[in-house]
Design a protein with these regions (language model features):
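Conserved C-lobe activation region of Hanks-type protein kinase-like domains
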Residues: 246-307
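Activation of the activation-loop gatekeeper triad in protein kinase-fold domains
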Residues: 201-207
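Terminal C-lobe "cap" of eukaryotic-type protein kinase domains
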Residues: 317-344
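Conserved structural core of kinase catalytic domains
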Residues: 75-145
Length: 353
């Protein structure tokens, strides 16, 4: 049995998903709400969890966290709305809005084969629209650029948070544990048009820093594939994770996968080793590198995107300093320029085999 901050009982409905830290359920008597319940071992470590949830809840009341889609506005993530306590009064989780009809980006990133993509969700009413929108080919490719573009706008907003009245909020938020599983995308009909609408999840993991205080999880979650070489510190760490995600959405390949080390880097094939040694296939060491024959066409598609976007990827994965990685603002401009370039034929742009 669980309770809200003012003592109302919460009954858990069906499970919506789970991650490394928690399970998320539908609220049994209010399906518009989702309930995140942390695992005991996480609660033991996260002594300031209640404080962070409270702070995020307050922030959600005052900050402009909406994006326009057609004539509607969507909240850009699942923000904590209330804490959840167990019967002895310990904080064990929080309540947020349910994201309906969303698919996590891990499925979109890997959606290459129409016979297996989204198969787990074959009976979901959205199955065919996900196939239609996100399959890694022709039309799906353009939508993956669109998705990356929206995400760059979303995160730009997060890093330059403003109040609803437009005043800047003096607060840095970073270390989102950005990875496909922490982002959902749904196709929503808004006044007669279908829009791809992303949602950022797992917001409890982030760090909030103002001039006086820093509020962060005692053991921030991270995921190796999205972890920048320097580890989670600031927004530049997130810029790395986001660039990996954009690369995966666009090229259906992790930037450091299927890269071979040639002579100079022959002592390691681990992805981590390549990341640390600046072995991005299009970076400074490219003359020492090759890409695996099976997958080379995927990295090879890099040459088909605009040089503006190529440079953003190179800066993201091959800069000397984390602060040289492109900002979300630069990504959104680069992606929009490419999307608006009428001479780009997205359905014929890439090789898929
Ligand atoms: N508001 C929500 N609406 C719908 N599904 C959600 C929501 N929040 C989380 N989920 C699902 O639950 C999974 C785990 O949630 P998450 O907050 O990422 O937990 P963890 O901190 O353990 O990673 C997500 O990957 C997603 O599939
Ligand atoms: Mg998660």
């Amino acid at each position: 049995m669980y309770k809200t901050s003012n003592g109302q009982a919460i009954k858990l409905g069906k499970e919506l998903g789970k991650g490394g830290a928690a399970n998320v359920y539908l609220h049994a008597s209010d399906k518009s709400k989702a309930v995140k319940i942390f695992k005991p071992e996480i609660l033991q470590k996260e002594v300031n969890l209640a404080k962070r949830i409270e702070k995020l809840n307050q922030l959600a009341q005052i900050a402009d966290i909406e994006m326009p889609f057609g004539n509607a506005k969507k909240t850009i993530g699942a923000w904590p709305k209330d804490i959840v306590k167990d019967l002895s009064g310990n904080v064990v989780g929080y309540i947020m809005d349910t994201v309906n009809g969303g698919i996590d980006l891990a499925f979109i990133v890997g959606a290459r084969d129409p016979t297996t993509a989204f198969l787990k969700y074959r009976s979901d009413p959205n199955y065919s629209s996900w196939l239609n929108y996100f399959l890694y080919q022709g039309r799906g490719l353009k939508n993956r650029f669109v998705l990356s573009y929206y995400l760059s706008l979303y995160f730009d907003k997060m890093y330059k948070l403003k109040a609803k009245n437009g005043a800047r909020i003096e607060l840095d938020i970073c270390n989102f544990d950005i990875k496909p599983k922490n982002i959902l995308a749904s196709i929503e009909n808004i006044s007669g048009h279908n829009h791809i609408v992303p949602y950022i999840l797992d917001l409890d993991n982030l760090t909030l820093k103002d001039i006086k205080h820093k509020l962060s999880p005692s053991s921030a979650q991270f995921t190796q594939e999205y972890r920048a070489p320097e580890g989670p510190i600031d927004k530049y760490y997130d810029y790395w994770s986001l660039a990996v995600l954009f690369y995966q959405l666009i090229f259906n390949q992790h930037p450091f996968d299927a890269v071979l080390g040639g002579t100079r880097f022959s002592d390691g094939t681990e992805r981590d080793f390549f990341i640390k040694n600046k072995c991005f296939p299009w970076g400074r060491n490219r003359k020492f590198l090759s890409v695996g024959t099976q997958n080379d066409f995927r990295h090879g598609n890099f040459l088909k995107i605009s040089s503006e976007l190529q440079h953003l990827f190179i800066r993201a994965f091959d800069s000397d300093l984390p602060s040289q990685r492109p900002s979300m603002d630069e990504w959104s401009r680069g992606l929009l320029d490419f999307l608006q370039n009428n001479s780009v034929q997205f359905d014929r742009l890439f090789r898929y085999k």
